[in-house]
Amino acid sequence: MLEKLEQIEARYEELGRLMGDPEVIADPEQLQKHARAHAALEDIVTTFRRYRQVSNELAEDKAMLEEEKDREFQELLKAEIERLTGEQERLEQELKILLLPKDPNDEKDIIMEIRAGAGGEEAALFAGDLFRMYQRYAEKKRWRTEIISSHPTELGGFKEIIFQVEGQGVYSRLKFESGVHRVQRIPTTESGGRIHTSTATVAVLPEAEEVDVEIKPEDLRVDIFCSSGPGGQSVNTTYSAVRITHLPTGLVVSCQDEKSQLKNKEKAMRVLRARLLDMARAEREGELAEERRSQVGSGDRSERIRTYNFPQNRVTDHRIGLTLHHLDQVLAGELDEIIDALVTTDQAERLKNMEA
């Protein structure tokens, strides 16, 4: 591990020198490329330098303890050795996590799809609650959200809503949200006051660049139609809505939220690229051995991942057994406590697999 860390430190220093090179400074593209690579290594190099400093101090204190005759000073040294040993172990664990292979999609923007599941109108209302929860979380993170396509219901829910989230590290934070979300509450339309259970499905797709997925024009069928509003009523007399079918896979994407046919087509293509990339990823992961899969979950959309219980103000993530009793705050976008726990569990599982 130390040899690898020394190589990373040498590369970090080399990048620092390159950023000061007049030729590189004169080329903004090269400068930006080196600056990004330098910033990506900063955390691991800072942690490694502190680890090395602590290790040196620890070795010096142990050597001094062997020579020291004064009882009082021996006790001081022992206390300092204990403190430094604890810090060294903590830093070593941090370095192991920092050395874990990065998910190549972690820095990508995402396309999130939320669909109402079992439960009729109540499921559609819950899909709307989830959309607003992620929207508020994005606001707190200073990320940008944009609705790509939506099918609203008359009571303010969504049969389906597809939206983009752009910002730093979006996929790394939201990738564990894929799966079936379950709600338990008394519907406003329920006169008997009985608790109903409804579901919504969330899919998180890293946004695909054109270079990530090759789509041949002859593989697409593009249909143009009039857009419609809640309950199927016509809201637009111009043919601006777009439906794209990818013939080799049978994937179909529709978009009607924009007044411009061109913009709807662009948005639909964005979703199609992301879905094709996700399909390729799922095929690759399907080939992996079961023991190499993350404990946090495979992102399988049929996996029930979380329950939101309104009467008890409780949210439970079933993958890690985490229960919180402030559902109201979670729905207001306070998701970090859950996401941090999921990330930590994923890191621990990957460390265990690497050490095995």
Curated annotation (Swiss-Prot):
What does the organism's lineage look like at the top?
Answer: Bacteria, Bacillati, Bacillota, Clostridia, Moorellales
Which cysteine pairs are covalently linked by disulfides here? none
| Function as written in the Swiss-Prot or TrEMBL entry | Peptide chain release factor 1 directs the termination of translation in response to the peptide chain termination codons UAG and UAA.
Q: Where is the composition biased (Basic and acidic residues)?
A: 284-306
Q: Name one Pfam family in it.
A: RF-1
Q: Which family does the entry's similarity section mention?
A: Belongs to the prokaryotic/mitochondrial release factor family.
Q: Which residues carry this modification: N5-methylglutamine?
A: 233
The protein's matches in InterPro entries, at most eight in alphabetical order, are given as: PCRF, Pep_chain_release_fac_I, Pep_chain_release_fac_I_sf, Prokaryotic/Mito_RF, RF-1
Q: Which GO terms describe its molecular function?
A: translation release factor activity, codon specific
Q: What is this protein called?
A: Peptide chain release factor 1
Q: What is its main location?
A: cytoplasm
Entry keyword Cytoplasm:
yes
